[in-house]
């Protein structure tokens, strides 16, 4: 209709000016079906798409160690402490006129250095200006990357180079003790829960009170699904209905633990001190300025330690090896 009106604009003008003899006949084409493929030209934006706000991020493991250990701050680049070593003698009951009991020990200085965790992203100034939320998304990404590295280092850093010395590096290996095959407390057809119960006992006879058990999600699921030969689910008497607590100690499930392994410990004996918390810096580096690039940098400085006198607070092992070690002959 619009095109027909345009074609007859002169006649319409005459009618407007009072020419009663003017008339217009407009023939409209036959009605047809309207289709996206035929009635909407390629450049048209109809219908409009609906886009969700925000950015869908890649799924990553959730860090968890800092929620379990002793965390604080430090004002130096070296954490030092004094600990007892080579203790001799002991207190005892003493008769009248008899020499009293003597005790002596050495004092040893120990230390752990502060290490730095860093990550950066280069992004164009145009992208920061034109893409909504990109700066906050980059900050969140860098933050998560730093936290994941800290988490992994506190758990399993090997202490070499710029690595922290993690809990597993100093943890005590699983030892069956009196539960070993052939010993008085050997276990008939042991399962994963039995292995954990013996590990808990090991921590306790080392004079520590375990407060967390770390396991891979698949191993937790295996415990949940364990059945007897008649098909009923096995639930040890020292475990809760959901198998999330063993002998009063909660299980923390995370893929940071290698499948098949476990760690039982008193996590108050693991210490983290931050020299510098998570910090973000934004600036130009090298030829960034001439290329319109901005560098966003995130870093943190921290130290982790488990005192040598506390190594017995943590027991780590492999489920298969542990079960074989306590199995009744």
Predicted features along the sequence, with ranges:
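Assembly-associated, polar helix/coil segments characteristic of icosahedral protein shells
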Residues: 1-107, 253
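Short, solvent-exposed loop/turn segments at the edges of secondary structure
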Residues: 76, 114-118, 291
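Short, Φ-rich (hydrophobic/aromatic) sequence segments
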Residues: 49-61, 134-150, 154, 199, ...
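Extended oligomerization regions of viral-like shell subunits
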Residues: 74, 80, 158-302, 311, ...
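Alpha-helical scaffold segments that mediate packing/assembly in large oligomeric complexes
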Residues: 95-199, 311-329
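Short loop/turn segments at secondary-structure transitions that flank enzyme active sites
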Residues: 85-90, 118, 127, 148, ...
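A short secondary-structure junction signal
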Residues: 93, 133, 224-228
